């Protein structure tokens, strides 16, 4: 499952891809490649080991999608505090940016 969540950060509208353990890495990779081509940046949020595994695989696949055009991807991990059904959870936010 792949869901987009719109956030406002630093005065800009930003899409955050919410990744689950059931997310298809190829679909997520396509979304990452599209966002990076469009905005030079993509953000993902994963909660749990399975979701993080799918997110990392997606970054590797997306890198293969954009590499032929001379774009390299870098990935910066960060912790994210998320509220789910009133309960605080710690997740991982992956910020993917292009590097030429």
Predicted regions and their residues:
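Short, Lys/Arg-enriched N-terminal segments with co-localized hydrophobic residues
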Residues: 1-13
């Amino acid at each position: 499952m792949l869901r987009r969540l719109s956030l406002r950060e630093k005065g800009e509208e930003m899409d955050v891809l919410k990744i689950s353990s059931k997310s298809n890495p190829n679909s997520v990779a396509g979304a990452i490649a599209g966002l990076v081509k469009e905005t030079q940046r993509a953000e993902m949020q994963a909660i749990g080991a399975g979701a993080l595994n799918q997110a990392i695989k997606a970054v590797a696949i997306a890198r293969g999608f954009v590499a032929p055009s001379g774009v390299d991807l870098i990935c910066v991990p960060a912790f994210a505090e998320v509220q789910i059904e009133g309960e605080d959870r710690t997740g991982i936010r992956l910020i993917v940016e292009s590097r030429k």
